[in-house]
Amino acid sequence: MRILILGSGVVGTASAYYLAKAGHEVTVLDRQRAAGMETSFANAGQVSPGYSAPWAGPGIPVKAIKWLLMHHRPLVVWPSLDPKLYLWLAKMLANCTEEAYRRNKARMVALAEYSRDALDALRSETGIAYDERMLGTLQLFRTRKQLDHVHSDTEVLDAHNVRYELLDPSGCIRAEPALARVRDKFVGGLRLPGDETGDAHIFTRNLADICARQGVTFRYGVTVEGLRHEAGRITGVALAGGEIATADIYVAAMGSYTPALLAPLGIRLPVYPVKGYSLTLPITDPDAAPRSTVMDETYKVAITRLGERIRVGGTAELAGFDLSLREPRRATLAHSVGDLFPAGGDISKATFWTGLRPMTPDGTPIIGPTKLDNLFTNTGHGTLGWTMACGSGRVLADLIGGRAPDIDTADLSVARYAEAA
């Protein structure tokens, strides 16, 4: 079949790879000049099945108030007249129960574990390189209260046979030796040895090259203006300049911009842009830098080694589609990395970036068919687009090809939101 994918981020490009591998004729459209130039460009670098969890959970409303009042705030909400923001927040709050948290985390971990295995297989098949490391993630707790609350997460990890290690400070230092310099800053950690790291942008660009050699067509600098439909099917994609691009199957993988594309069709995706920031700084002392990813639980900041660089990613800012770089967010990232790895990198040479994470209220992406026969979605991965990209692309290819995916996908489509079913 001829398949048109809208979006060449890590999720759209991974979808192209698996669909082409299944024998389809694939074309990818993107407004940027190359693949992976938006949310995939400078994210935290984690491929972290074990850390896959919804933001909505028990106690989050109270924690959110605390975060909003912190000097280095992990959460920022700007006043808005956009009703979509408040509808999304209401749905998120409805998922803050213990039952919903366990259900959502379980399916997120299942997809993320499957995706990590798919990534490993893809790497073996193609030899793709992306500053990858397979040294796990260390979730670092600065307070005893944080450490005591980790047990609800480990119960889900146990249920899915995800390996983990609860560590005292000495164990944390064995995992990340550079932390010996700041031993007084933390009380323990949760290590997820099956997690990986890598540069999502490099991966996406290299995978796009592999796809192109497999016959996938990438059309960059193309602006999608809308979808044409008739009799319950998409009949074409309207592009700037008047062109109508056609195919047999259409895949919407435009991240935070997907809801606006589908809304005129009567498909309401509860996906809202949650702005994240990152710093990328050169390593000055390899022995004083992280070996893999350290997640600073207090500030919700991930500090990741990518080759000769340190990537520092974090902050959840609800500001619509605003992409301005705000200095207080930079200060939070700089504080976290400077506090834990003070001699690891040169903060004066850091590059500052921001991107929009497409978040659903329950944390789970929206993958699969819609009410239009030939329209599929692959979006809503939030902070886990890199973690879930390969598994999501493989699941999508199976669904389009009429094959049963290797994992349960019953709750991945938009149908789980009753008003959009």
Swiss-Prot record:
Gene Ontology CC terms: cytoplasm; plasma membrane
Catalytic function, reaction form: a D-alpha-amino acid + A + H2O = a 2-oxocarboxylate + AH2 + NH4(+)
Enzyme's top EC category: oxidoreductase
One Pfam family cited in the UniProt record for this chain: DAO
Disulfide feature: none
InterPro entries xref list: DadA (IPR023080), FAD-dep_OxRdtase (IPR006076), FAD/NAD-bd_sf (IPR036188)
Its EC number(s): 1.4.99.-
Keyword Secreted: no
Pathway: Amino-acid degradation; D-alanine degradation; NH(3) and pyruvate from D-alanine: step 1/1
HAMAP family: DadA (MF_01202)
Family, similarity comment: Belongs to the DadA oxidoreductase family.
Protein purpose: Oxidative deamination of D-amino acids.
Name of this chain's protein: D-amino acid dehydrogenase
Organism of derivation: Xanthobacter autotrophicus (strain ATCC BAA-1158 / Py2)
Highest classification ranks of the organism: Bacteria, Pseudomonadati, Pseudomonadota, Alphaproteobacteria, Hyphomicrobiales
